Amino acid sequence: SEYIRQILSEYKSPKFDYLPSFTGGLVGYFSYDYLGYKEKSIRGKAKDTEDFKDVDLMLFDKVIAFDNLCQKIILIANMPLDAPETGYNKAIVELKQLRELLMHGEKKQNMGGKLLGEVTPLFDKEQYCEMVEKAKHHIKEGDIFQIVLSNRLSAPFEGSLFDTYRVLRTINPSPYMFYFSGTDVEVAGASPETLVKLENGVLHTFPLAGTRPRGTTEEEDKELEAGLLADEKELAEHNMLVDLGRNDLGKVSKFGSVKVEKLHSIERYSHVMHIGSTVRGEIRDEYDALDA
């Protein structure tokens, strides 16, 4: 964490209202296993069969941002402050090179993508049910409040993951979408949920739980919404996530600043609707994004 903080302090990109929220810096992922470095008691013993790194971050000092609303491209090049004149001239050259690449670069052919075989789960039904029973035991014993049991689905794939991601953006537009190509891993995904966000000293987390399919008509959509908001099980699960969100933000927020800004709001997406809430807090002076 301290090494990452050092990089962030040395390569801190300025913020301007007329520019995108990201103008340069670190991009990548922290795996769930990374939490074990902060919370020793929950460090996992299982081996990841895909050999994902615990942390994979890349530093970017140039950005090409596409404004979907205004349909325009913004080119950004960062410059060091220790040699402003040299840095400025270098940034101008880099911006011209980026523009030339976009205007006259070789056009990429869309390769698409397809699955070459059946989708298979990591755990079969018997193994998964065994995990459920084990989880229920730990809940009864008070070891945990809630657990998300995952089951990886795998299939052989051929083609371009980036082109597949472009299709995903079209058929399932979501608030949180990503494509990441590292040295040894390529990942794409779409999610309605942003786990945590820190901006201008304010933390937000967005609990999302409780799901129904979208209706084929507006009337059916409203009926499904009413049924979702009347479902005691769905509301209980959602309220637990809200409480956990308040508790988590409270660990790094100023006393008395944690509040529920929005509770039990229906959020609609292309295929489903969810119950969503928003929890905010003001981060303490001694903490930063890595602590959050």
Which residues make up each language-model segment?
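Extended alpha-helical targeting/anchoring segments
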Residues: 1-292
